[in-house]
Regions:
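Alpha/beta-hydrolase superfamily serine-hydrolase fold, recognizing
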Residues: 1-210
Length: 210
């Protein structure tokens, strides 16, 4: 709710934050199914896809990407834009930052991320970690909307953001990558100067896109 409030203040837009089913009780694809239901609800209410910006942080960043990919797979209109804060895009955990930033990130650990991905995939799943359904970094990203990606230099998931921005650019998706010095996972929720700067940047990005 902290980030939802900050998004509303920085963008001047209405913000809908929804609860979705969580792992391990509700593993993949429960979360994406719930997100699609919310998308369908917004469309049913007469809110056009081009009037919606989908935002998410951490696992929510993964969900935001997977929602856009699911909408694309259904042949439907994309949201106006994506705003991703420290998104989790690569469940293979092979990015360089998983080792280089292990001692720097005060929020996440390698073991914690491993336990989260195992819970999210589900005990009976046969999906590989590089499957785009789990790791949107490896998806066909063409046709996705303009995307703002924010990440801190000190976070384990830094590679997820850097590699996503690179993949999007290579696939002709407009992507803006912002890397904030000495910041950690989802630093935007904290009362620090870099968080204020990041939220101001989100506001500028949204107003430019709209």
């Amino acid at each position: 709710r902290v980030l939802a409030s900050k998004l509303a203040l920085s963008t001047g837009c209405d913000v809908l934050s929804f609860e979705y089913r969580l792992a391990p009780e509700a593993p993949y694809p429960s979360a994406i199914d719930d997100a699609l239901r919310v998308w369908d609800y917004l469309m049913y209410m007469g809110i056009g896809a081009r009037d919606v910006i989908v935002a998410g942080d951490s696992a929510g960043g993964n969900l935001a990407l997977e929602l856009a990919l699911a909408v694309k797979a259904q042949g439907r209109s994309q949201p106006c834009a994506l705003v991703l804060m420290s998104p989790w895009t690569d469940m293979t955990m092979q990015g360089a930052s998983y080792q280089k930033c292990a001692a720097l990130d005060p929020m996440l650990t390698h073991d914690y991320i491993d336990s989260c991905r195992t819970a999210y995939r589900g005990a009976n799943s046969t999906l590989e970690w590089e499957d785009p359904s789990l790791s949107p970094l490896f998806a066909d990203l063409r046709g996705l909307p303009p995307t703002l990606i924010q990440v801190g230099t000190n976070e384990i998931l830094k590679s997820d953001s850097i590699n996503l921005a690179k993949a999007m650019t290579e696939q002709e998706v407009y992507a803006v990558l912002e890397v904030y010095p000495e910041c950690w996972h989802v630093f935007q929720q904290m009362p620090i100067p870099h968080a204020a700067q990041a939220m101001e940047s989100v506001g500028r990005f949204v107003q430019k896109i709209l």
